[in-house]
Amino acid sequence: MQIFVKTLTGKTITLEVEPSDTIENVKAKIQDKEGIPPDQQRLIFAGKQLEDGRTLSDYNIQKESTLHLVLRLRGGAKKRKKKSYTTPKKNKHKRKKVKLAVLKYYKVDENGKISRLRRECPSDECGAGVFMGSHFDRHYCGKCCLTYCFNKPEDK
């Protein structure tokens, strides 16, 4: 019987085969006509790839059926190397926890009276508990940017 093999280029080859012929035999005949090695050939019929060990009758291939020839692609994508960094990774900044840190903002005199060492920001935006930074010539609030300047550096 006669079957047709359509290649990727659109060329159609006619082959004389028997229903009892194996797929390997068909690939060998294609190699004789086209010169494509059988290990690079993939034959497809009715959307299925034909396996080498089976016969044409197993796939119900009858006379004047058309097989599609596709070339086998070997391998896959190139394996990527793992990145190696030359400089070590920076450690994340950890805030130091100081026990009883609030005590540095207050002073207790010999009578037991508590007085503030830092000035508290009077702005409504900041609220209670926000202290102003003490500089040599001014008090400065880091939250709302309120600044009180001294006339003379001695007037702290």
Curated annotation (Swiss-Prot):
Domain of life: Eukaryota
Positions of transmembrane segments: none
Matching InterPro entries: Ribosomal_eS31, Ribosomal_eS31_euk-type_sf, Ribosomal_zn-bd, Ubiquitin-like_dom, Ubiquitin-like_domsf, Ubiquitin_CS, Ubiquitin_dom, Ubiquitin_ubiquitin-like
Zinc-finger ranges (C4-type): 121-144
Covalent cross-link site, Glycyl lysine isopeptide (Lys-Gly) (interchain with G-Cter in ubiquitin): 6, 11, 27, 29, 33, 48, 63, 107, 113
GO BP of this protein: cytoplasmic translation; ribosomal small subunit biogenesis; translation at postsynapse; translation at presynapse
Positions where Phosphoserine occurs in the chain: 65
UniProt similarity note: In the N-terminal section; belongs to the ubiquitin family. In the C-terminal section; belongs to the eukaryotic ribosomal protein eS31 family.
Entry protein name: Ubiquitin-ribosomal protein eS31 fusion protein
Organism the protein comes from: Mus musculus
Lineage, broadest ranks: Eukaryota, Metazoa, Chordata, Craniata, Vertebrata
Record gene name: Rps27a
